[in-house]
Structure formats: structure tokens, C-alpha cells
Amino acid sequence: MAHEFLHLVWHPGWGLSSQSLMLIWPRRLLVAVYYEGFMPRTRWLVMRLSPLVGLTVLPTLVLLVIYPCEVSFFWQQFIVLVILVNSLGAGGDLVASVIVARQVASGGQVGNWNGRAYWRAEKAIGSEAA
């Protein structure tokens, strides 16, 4: 749930837009977020990678910093569990980010429209406004 929340807050409108949806499907043990529309490539990359940074990289750094201090075994193991579970869940985010970083120009936009993922170049964005 925290993983998806970190995606959600990086949607345009900080996840409060009518274009942002959170899907909770208990029967399939699925929690997901979806944004119907486009966002700049950089924002999309930040949105995709924020759970990896927030729930894997930062907790790892915290463990390294507090390691010499007296921290209970329970909390150390809890943080390690969060890191491991999130690392597995963020694998798809990492792959998608590499694909977008390689294929979409820096001025482009990435998004979903009618349930399908698309990207569009900067020139296409400018021609729509005209």
C-alpha cells in the first residue's frame, strides 16, 4: 500500500485529480494506481522510481547509519523485510523506467489513454496546442 501511495503522490495534482485512480482488489491481493492522461517524461520517471527510492534505497541508508547504534533486532529485521519485499515489487517499475528513459525523448510525455500506455514526442505536444 505504501508502494502505491508513493506512486500516487507523484501523479499530476498529487494524486487528488479525477484522473488518478487507486484500485484495491482483495480477491487478487492487488493494489494499484492508474493515471488516465499524460505527464512529462521526467515526472513519470520520478513517479515510477519513488517507491524504489523511498522504500528500498532510503531504508538501506538508514540501516547503514544506525547500524553502530543500539537498535532492537525486531526493527532491524522489519526494515530488512520492507527492503526485500519492496525490491521485488519495484522490479517492474525499474524495467519500465529503463525502457522509457531509453526510448522517450527528454521533452516527451508518457501516459495512459483508454487503458493503454503511450508516449508522445515534444513536437506532437506543440502541434496539439496550435
Q: Which sequence ranges carry the predicted segments?
A:
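Small-residue-rich helix-interface/hinge motifs
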Residues: 4-38
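Metalloprotease/metallohydrolase-associated module, dominated by Zn2+-dependent proteases
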Residues: 27-122, 130
